[in-house]
Regions:
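Short, positively charged and aromatic/hydrophobic N-terminal segments
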Residues: 15-18
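NAD(P)H dinucleotide-binding glycine-rich loop of Rossmann-like/cofactor-binding domains
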Residues: 68, 106-171
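Intrinsic-disorder-associated, low-complexity terminal segments enriched in Asp/Asn/His/Tyr and depleted
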Residues: 7-11
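Mid-domain Rossmann-like dinucleotide-binding core that forms the NAD(H)/NADP(H) cofactor-binding site
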Residues: 143-216, 220-221
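Glycine-rich beta-strand-centered segment in the early N-terminal region that forms part
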Residues: 44-61, 71-114
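Hydrophobic alpha-helical segments, chiefly the membrane-spanning helices
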Residues: 253-259
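Conserved small/polar residues in nucleotide/adenosyl-binding loops
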Residues: 241-248
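N-terminal Rossmann-like NAD(P) cofactor-binding module of classical short-chain dehydrogenase/reductase
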Residues: 235
Length: 259
């Protein structure tokens, strides 16, 4: 998902930096909790320092991990600005920056947090140029989830044609990308979801089979779907697969992996 931020038509004084010419605002929290703790506040940021760039955001990515930061499941020092992913335009750069220039369209993901803002300072060497033909909204919505899917399918276990894989949360952000990608690689995807609506979405994204997460014996169902062979890889982001280690091993093919 993504949200829009920023004003692409803002006219800046030639004698003032962007950070000084605009009221920069950010979604911040001063305590952990539900959505009610989110505050849209004015913030002061400096001009970019050594190796840094000032980014005017045009779109921000929304990720499930943001709720972990907001609720304190992953505790961080307060107060803080939320958000791990955004796209925008480079407004100015600090000393020693050579990879990006003012006016470049870029996207980023990762620490430090602070993507829920109209503009921010960010390490220039972590900025990714947005190719022509890719919108800022698409870039902001898929970078973190796309990189995660890439790592799962190409590094954790290199999926190949003929493989069968078990994918949890198959209708989520990462799952939607991973299901399509795995099918493109020639794999058969068994998706695990929690609702009928998500089941339809999982099938639409490339899952050949769907298992509901309240299934009493997912491992047995996997064995039945694979003719007793098991899957090449289990991608379990929910840690719901099975508490029975013997069942788990029996539904993963020889040499397969649980990730």
């Amino acid at each position: 998902m993504f949200g829009k931020f920023g004003d692409s038509n803002l006219n800046l004084s030639p004698t003032l930096g962007y950070a000084r010419a605009m009221d920069i605002r950010a979604i911040r929290i001063h305590e952990y909790g539900g959505p009610e703790v989110l505050k849209f506040e004015s913030v002061d940021i400096p001009e970019p320092g050594e190796g840094e760039a000032l980014i005017r955001h045009t779109a921000i990515g929304l990720n499930f991990i943001d709720t972990y930061h907001r609720t304190g499941l992953y505790p961080l020092d307060l107060p803080l600005s939320l958000g791990t992913e955004a796209a925008g335009v480079v407004e100015s750069i600090g000393p020693g920056v050579g990879d990006v220039s003012p006016g470049d369209r870029v996207v980023y993901t990762g620490l430090p947090l602070g993507a829920y803002s109209t503009a921010r300072i960010y390490p220039a060497d972590r900025l990714v140029p947005i190719p022509d033909g890719i919108t800022d909204e698409d870039a902001a919505a898929v970078l973190l989830k796309g990189l995660t899917a890439w790592y799962l399918l190409r590094r954790s276990y290199p999926v190949k044609s003929g493989d069968t894989v078990l994918l949890y949360a198959a209708a989520g952000g990462v799952g939607s990308i991973a299901a399509q990608w795995a099918r493109h690689l020639g794999a058969t995807v068994i998706g695990v979801v929690s609702t009928d609506e998500k089941a339809d979405r999982g099938r639409d994204k490339g899952c050949a089979h769907i298992i509901m997460s309240d299934n009493a014996d997912i491992a047995l169902t996997v064995k039945e779907l694979t003719g007793g062979k098991g899957v090449a890889a289990v991608y379990d982001s929910c840690l719901l697969y099975t508490s029975d280690a013997a069942d788990e091993r029996s539904s993963v093919d020889l040499g397969g992996r649980r990730i």
